[in-house]
Every structure is written in structure tokens, then in C-alpha cells.
């Protein structure tokens, strides 16, 4: 069992929005192909990190990796993300990229959409590559949306939330673009909470009362 950080509903001054792209859905068998993070201080961007990862760089000798023949990802993932096999060929390996990525993130609060998915991949990779645990506390925009917007929406994909808040989604499915969209969605949801409940604590109490009545 992964010993991850705690799920929060907060509005911190400093946080990191993260997103990843992978070869598939299972962190035990699939690999990272892109990681991104944007740091916000006082809710304004101050820095960003974005890099592709060659998922075989750390697994095979360089002379076995052929730019024209080596298959790193499926056609489905290529079509979904716009990341091609040729783009991944020249990328660095997971260990090198993750070392810089986790240094960029530091101990800050993490925000992401369905962020447990991202955390699971990063957690497993860091444990495998460096023997360290990834335990930052996190805010999941999916979790907030399911409670906050359940009367307005039937689905809570990032696209659904972007459409609901009239946020441009045309460049989605690259990691850093998804970070930007997730940040904008998060800020809009926090605005809704403050407008409708006054404070996050009032929102928590309202949710708690609904659970007890339900």
C-alpha cells in the first residue's frame, strides 16, 4: 500500500499543479512519458517544469534504441497526447528527469485533477529509482467537483469542468497544458466556494451535515 500524503480542501497561497502523461493506466506495468508542474505563489505563476521521458532509456542500451523503429507508445496514446515515438526517442530517462522534477516540486501542496493517478505513478517511480517516498499533501479538483458541482454536471472530466467554466480546452492532453487548465478550474471552484459559502470551513461544515443527514 502506498503511504501517500493527505487529501485536503484548502486555498493555499503557494502550491504546485502537476500532470503526467503515461504509456497506459497501470502504474505497476506502464511508464511515464511526460511530467509537468507549475508553481504558483499568491495564485500567480512563478515557475514551470515540463519534460518528456524516454520510457526505455533506463531499460535498454542506447544502441538498441532506434529512432525510426523503436516503439515507445501505442497509436492510441500518440493520438491522445500528440506525443510521438520520435519525440520520445531523444528524451532523457526517467531517473534523470524525476530527480529534477521532484526537486522542483519540493514539499509544496500539490493540486491535480484525479491527482491520485499522477501521485501513484510518481510514487512508484521514485520508490523504484531512488528508494524515497512521495508524500506531499494534495488537493484533487475531481474530488471537489463531484461534491461542489453535482447539481450542475453529470460528468466531471477535466474537459467537463473546463466547459462549465468556459476555459479553453483546445490544447489539452499535453501535461503542461493540463496543468494550466487544472489551475484555472481550481481557482474557479474556489471562487464558487467563497461566493456561496463564505469560507472553506463553512463549505466543509455543509458537506459534513449533508453526509450525516444522508
Model-assigned labels for residue ranges:
Residues 97, 181-182:
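Short Asp/Glu-rich motifs
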Residues 1-10, 164, 183-214:
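Acidic two-metal-ion nuclease catalytic site recognized across multiple nuclease folds
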Residues 178:
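Conserved catalytic/binding loops enriched for acidic/polar residues
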Residues 138-154:
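Short alpha-helix plus adjacent loop in nuclease-associated cores
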Residues 137-140, 200-202:
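Beta-strand segments within the central parallel beta-sheet cores of soluble alpha/beta enzyme folds
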Residues 2-123, 128, 132-136, 155-167, ...:
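Conserved non-catalytic scaffold segment of RNase H-like nuclease domains
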Amino acid at each position: 500500500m502506498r503511504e501517500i500524503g493527505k487529501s485536503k480542501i484548502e486555498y493555499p497561497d503557494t502550491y504546485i499543479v502537476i500532470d503526467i502523461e503515461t504509456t497506459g493506466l497501470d502504474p505497476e506495468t506502464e511508464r511515464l512519458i511526460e511530467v509537468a508542474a507549475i508553481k504558483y505563489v499568491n495564485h500567480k505563476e512563478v515557475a514551470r517544469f515540463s519534460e518528456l521521458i524516454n520510457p526505455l532509456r533506463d531499460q535498454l542500451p542506447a544502441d538498441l534504441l532506434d529512432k525510426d523503429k523503436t516503439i515507445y507508445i501505442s497509436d492510441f496514446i500518440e493520438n491522445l497526447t500528440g506525443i510521438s515515438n520520435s519525440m520520445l526517442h531523444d528524451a532523457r530517462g526517467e531517473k534523470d528527469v524525476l530527480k529534477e522534477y521532484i526537486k522542483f516540486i519540493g514539499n509544496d501542496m500539490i493540486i491535480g485533477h484525479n491527482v491520485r493517478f499522477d501521485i501513484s505513478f510518481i510514487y512508484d517511480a521514485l520508490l523504484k529509482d531512488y528508494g524515497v517516498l512521495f508524500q506531499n499533501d494534495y488537493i484533487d479538483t475531481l474530488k471537489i467537483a463531484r461534491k461542489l458541482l453535482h447539481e450542475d454536471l453529470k460528468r466531471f472530466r477535466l474537459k467537463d469542468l473546463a466547459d462549465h467554466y468556459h476555459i479553453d480546452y483546445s490544447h489539452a492532453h499535453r501535461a503542461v497544458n493540463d496543468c494550466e487548465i487544472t489551475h484555472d478550474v481550481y481557482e474557479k471552484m474556489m471562487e464558487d466556494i467563497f461566493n456561496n459559502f463564505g469560507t472553506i470551513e463553512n463549505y466543509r461544515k455543509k458537506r459534513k451535515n449533508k453526509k450525516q443527514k444522508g
